[in-house]
């Protein structure tokens, strides 16, 4: 909007001298009037109000470190090279407790004979490891 044509007038198109002074001209600052006179506009724009969902207390929730069986199958030779796993009886023996991994999940393919020690296994991970001739040892 070209403002040159408003120059010389007292309020330059801002209405009366009382307008364009503070937030009262705009119905408040920020979210003021959010559940009152601004509510209908906000409803059509899709704003959400109020609390939603549930947060677990920090002492209950924790992050579980995981690895997939497909990744284990690929990493087994490298773990032996690094001294983090060993080969006994034609099987890769991997202790995931030493690596800080708590659970094994079943995504991927298992082609090698793996003997895995871990705190937890998903049903599909246990099934795939045992189908390839390996075994799952639950660490307690």
Curated annotation (Swiss-Prot):
GO terms for biological process: translation. Residues 1-31 are annotated as: Disordered. The keyword Ribosomal protein applies. The keyword Ribonucleoprotein applies. GO terms for cellular component: cytosolic large ribosomal subunit. Keywords: Ribonucleoprotein, Ribosomal protein, RNA-binding, rRNA-binding. GO terms for molecular function: rRNA binding; structural constituent of ribosome. It holds the Pfam family Ribosomal_L27A. Gene3D superfamilies: 3.100.10.10, 4.10.990.10. InterPro entries: Rbsml_uL15_N, Ribosomal_uL15, Ribosomal_uL15/eL18, Ribosomal_uL15/eL18_sf, Ribosomal_uL15_CS. Binds to the 23S rRNA. Belongs to the universal ribosomal protein uL15 family. Part of the 50S ribosomal subunit. PANTHER family: 60S RIBOSOMAL PROTEIN L27A, LARGE RIBOSOMAL SUBUNIT PROTEIN UL15. This is Large ribosomal subunit protein uL15. It comes from Methanosarcina barkeri (strain Fusaro / DSM 804).
